[in-house]
Curated annotation (Swiss-Prot):
Keyword check for Signal: yes
Signal sequence extent: 1-26
Disulfide partners: C29-C43, C36-C48, C42-C52, C47-C56
Location(s) in or outside the cell: Secreted
Originating organism: Conus emaciatus (False virgin cone)
Family: Belongs to the conotoxin I2 superfamily.
Name under which the protein is recorded: Conotoxin Em11.5
One Pfam family hit: Conotoxin_I2
PROSITE patterns per record: I_CONOTOXIN (PS60019)
Highest taxon, organism lineage: Eukaryota
Keywords: Amidation, Cleavage on pair of basic residues, Disulfide bond, Secreted, Signal, Toxin
Keyword rRNA processing: no
Xref: InterPro entries: Conotoxin-I_CS, Conotoxin_I2
């Protein structure tokens, strides 16, 4: 009887630990200077072009010109 209770208790403890690890791993965030995305957020700062930074720099590039 004691063996059965111990086995069940151990089994329930393993299930609880696996659930805890799942929550921790799915809600983790990434520090500055690492890769980020919509589903992998930054801990602090913003996700700019796939990288965690404090602020997003303005994007410079070619602008379309209207031709008449």
């Amino acid at each position: 009887m004691m063996f059965r209770l111990t086995s069940v208790g151990c089994f329930l403890l393993v299930i609880a630990c696996l659930n805890l690890f799942q929550v921790v791993l799915t809600r983790r965030c990434f520090p500055l200077g690492t890769f980020c995305s919509r589903y992998l957020p930054c801990c602090s700062g913003m996700c700019c072009s796939g990288w965690c930074t404090r602020r997003c720099a303005p994007r410079f590039g070619k602008r379309a010109t209207f031709q008449e």
